[in-house]
Amino acid sequence: MILYDSAYEAFITDPTLPRSIYAIEGAKNCAIEFCSLSKTAGFTGTRFSYTVVPEELVFETSNGGTLSLHNMWNRRQCTKFNGTPYIIQYAGAKVFTEEGMKECQENIGYYRENARMIAETLEKKGISFTGGVNSPYIWFECPKGMESWEFFDYLLENAQVVGTPGAGFGENGRIISV
């Protein structure tokens, strides 16, 4: 099974890339998609999200029967979850209005432009990086063998730039994101 977080789908500009996992043939039989609107609409921390569990997503039980994951998910949500507060639901609904979608695209455009400027600067300096296209983040290796937290401190103190240390992403974390 594939669990697909579509938090960054609104940053995708390449028309050949899928914005939903369900744009890929066969995904309804093997994938669940969720999105919090944290990146699309700045809803970080509000606990407003959606989850798509297709009716086609079924599993075989040990006794040879089938089990609908869609039905199990619905049962779980109805039993354990009291719902998102009304004020957050109202704000979430506004995201999907014409005006809300326009405002979201304006904000995303701001982040895209920041990524473009950072990428342009890194290219001019000859610094190899990844990201910045179809994503708001740019990742590059820390210089001179510095650890990512050490480079984070250096950037903050010397350039007043805040990045994300790669150490939190595993053992190959000698990278930083800006």
Roles of regions detected by a PLM:
Residues 1-178:
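PLP-dependent class I/II
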